[in-house]
Amino acid sequence: MRLLMRDGKCNICGERVRMVRESLGLSQEALAARIQLNGHSLTQKAISRIEMGLRIVPDYEIPLFADALNVDPLWLIGLDPPQIHGGAK
């Protein structure tokens, strides 16, 4: 299996996860605990590897981080939230 990387990293959300986690004053262990409270198993080591860009983040984990950090999942992957403009009348 060939691993695709971008700018030498396995994910695009790790830096944003770290930025928000640190701004909230959370340790990696505390973030892991928040995610585990929702019934999902992510360890401190996994979060460390994600933040360093050494671990792939499957699409199903993006909402886990978004919920635990109270951010928009689209922002985590580098996209702005969709803009809704006036609909058809």
Question: Model segments located where?
Answer:
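Short, basic-rich loop-to-helix N-cap that marks the start of a DNA-contacting helix
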Residues: 45, 52-67, 83
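Short, charged recognition helix plus adjacent turn
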Residues: 1-8, 67, 74-89
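A short, Lys/Arg-rich alpha-helix, primarily the initiator
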Residues: 1-24
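Hydrophobic micro-packing sites on short alpha-helices
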Residues: 31, 61-66, 76-77
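Short alpha-helical DNA-recognition segment
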Residues: 25-49
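Residue-level detection of the helix-turn-helix DNA-binding "recognition helix"
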Residues: 22, 36-37, 52, 81
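Residues that mark the N-terminal boundary/hinge immediately upstream of a DNA-recognition element
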Residues: 16, 27, 43, 58-61, ...
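Alpha-helical residues within the helix-turn-helix
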Residues: 22, 33, 67
